[in-house]
Amino acid sequence: MALTDFLVEELNGLKQAGLYRPLKELQSPQRPRSIIDGREVINLSSNNYLGLADDPRLKQAMIEATEAYGAGSGAVRTIIGTMTIHNQLEQKLAEFKHVEAAVVFQSGFTCNSGVIPVLVGEGDAVISDELNHASIIDGCRLSKAKIHRYKHADMDDLARVLKETDGQYRRRLIITDGVFSMDGDIAPLPDIVELAEKHGCMTYVDDAHSSGVLGKNGRGSVNHFGLDGRVTVQVGTLSKAVGVLGGYVAGPRALIELLWHKGRPFLFSTSHPPGVAAACLKAIEIMEQEPERIDRLWENTRYFKERLTELGFDTGKSETPITPVIVGDEVKAMQLSDRLLEEGVFAQGIAFPTVPRGKARVRTIVTAAHTKEDLDEALAAFAKVGRELGLI
């Protein structure tokens, strides 16, 4: 018996359960109509909210920075991998988020795994929404702080946890997603911040799916609720609405400088290629100059969500461009996804462990770049397949 036979057994279990998902090959840029495995399909699974991933201005910025600085940085940030373009991007992000300073990480995931252990450790407590992203869960575990979970977006339960933990720890950190990636609902940040201030807790908001979507010019959920200056730490991504790659932390200068010294993913990873940093910088500039992109995103979101609901689909509590079509049964959710693809619509099926058992779904995301024709064609496919499978 080979030492790796258990891997084959686990894979076979996924296949027998109908949950094995091969990697699909994207053979075009991220566009509303993309080429996947040789076919043009309507793309409803991209995080490219504002349609910037294929914007010619980002590509030109990347080309010019590559010619000026080279293809790669060749070092970690703390040795000789901090280039002028990295500093320019971080200064722009700090201004954009209305904070003292910002620092860029290699991904949004590594932001959370790197920052949380710097804020809290043994003798401290993390108070986390039960539906927070996997990267937050990992960051909390790595911190070795005591983890307390409160029921999703339940402020009475959060108040209970805070009252029970008053005076029990050196420091406490309340962590929440700004927008929850599987359900598309928005965290009740005003109530969270008020409770945090009442109980003397730091606050931490992961704005991965809020950046470019909520707030003035896409500044995120904190700005959306008028809470600038009242949230300790904001984490954002450069790979979704910004359309490129990476994540960032925005907050007090003391935190940012401490992350230079103690943020392990930052310390031990080569910095972004200069072309990536330049494209991110250009995207932020476009977001400031073209607010109509966000207006189109929300027009498309409202239209698509309303039509799905009219057809009889369960879209849960979504308030954002993330619109789940909740099926429940895992196999049937995957069947819905597969049949939609046959009808020319790519919408990824999501099942356990990404979502709880009994909550399997097809997750859709519309973008600013979709046309009404794109959305109507996708809705027709949902109607046809939904009736075939007895979902509506």
From Swiss-Prot:
Name of the top EC class for this enzyme: transferase
Superkingdom per UniProt: Bacteria
Pathway the protein takes part in: Cofactor biosynthesis; biotin biosynthesis
Keywords for this protein: Acyltransferase, Biotin biosynthesis, Pyridoxal phosphate, Transferase
Catalytic activity of the protein: 6-carboxyhexanoyl-[ACP] + L-alanine + H(+) = (8S)-8-amino-7-oxononanoate + holo-[ACP] + CO2
The UniProt record lists the keyword Transferase: yes
Pfam families on file: Aminotran_1_2 (PF00155)
EC number: 2.3.1.47
One GO MF term attached to the UniProt entry: pyridoxal phosphate binding
Swiss-Prot/TrEMBL GO biological process terms: biotin biosynthetic process
Protein purpose: Catalyzes the decarboxylative condensation of pimeloyl-[acyl-carrier protein] and L-alanine to produce 8-amino-7-oxononanoate (AON), [acyl-carrier protein], and carbon dioxide.
Family: Belongs to the class-II pyridoxal-phosphate-dependent aminotransferase family. BioF subfamily.
Name of this protein: 8-amino-7-oxononanoate synthase
Organism for this UniProt entry: Symbiobacterium thermophilum (strain DSM 24528 / JCM 14929 / IAM 14863 / T)
